[in-house]
Amino acid sequence: MTNSDFKIALLVLYIFIFLFGTLNVILMSCMLQSQRHLSFTKVSVINLIAVHSIFLLTLPFRIYYYASNKDWILGMYFCKIVSLMIHAHMYLAFIFYAFLLIVRYVEHSSQRHKLEFHRILHATIASTTVWLIIFGSMFPVTIYYGKMQNDSTQCFHFGKALEQPSVKIFNYGTCTLVILVWSVLAFFQVYFLLYVSKTFGKATCQRQEFWAQLKNVVFLSVMFFCFVPYQGFRVYYVSEYGKTAEIHHINEVFLAVTAFSCFDMIVFAGRDVCKLINSRGWFNCL
């Protein structure tokens, strides 16, 4: 595939993500209106809405860059911000997915009560801590990231930093950690599914516990299809960087796929979304 072919592919992907991602954020916001208690799940969903919304604000700049086929005219630092936001979106979303699944696993283990935040302050502190850790670690990266990129008219070409051994090690470690965390979560999910199946036998499909576990499987599937392929290919990309020009474009496509996590609630709560639209009407949510 030529360079223009990859640009067209990225353009189509980002337009699709922007349109349906925006729809997803609107529907998620509407669904939260019906939840009164400040549960751990609701806090995670609120954070996911914020993560998706901030990322979606940067997508028009990517779309314009790939659609116009012209030079980047907004400066290198803004290019860095737009470039880093897709990475921040990926890792923040992954953290909140993992947090949400862990809470649901704990709730399943101790079925006596549902975990809730009893004070808004506690939820705010917990959420702010995660945001500060991610963006605090990315602030110095924003300053030093892309110093080897001398052409300010081209954006999203910062791969030369991978020539540094420390950057390679950091990438290997991050990719391994993400895949490892997902694998551990998947292991516990299989355990809980087997436990529910063994406990209820033939009546498993009629039990609420089983369908609750299937919802967890949906989140795990979103994490797997959106994040794991990129992390797996990233290991290969880092080790083979610079050998072919095509590998950079393939990496960008895998990176774009991570943004499909913006559709999480449409997939997770499809039936509830349909009920919401039918009962309240589309414009009541706007």
Each model region followed by its residue ranges:
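Seventh transmembrane helix
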Residues: F225, G232, H249-L286
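Extracellular TM2-ECL1-early TM3 structural module of rhodopsin-like
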Residues: F6-L11, T41-V43, N47, V51-L100
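Extracellular N-terminal segment of 7TM GPCRs
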Residues: M1-I26, L38
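Intracellular effector-coupling site of seven-transmembrane GPCRs
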Residues: Y191-G232
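Juxtamembrane membrane-interface segments at transmembrane-helix boundaries in membrane proteins
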Residues: M1-L11, W72-M85, Q154-N171, R207-F210, ...
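Loop architecture of class A 7-transmembrane GPCRs
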Residues: R119, G136-L180
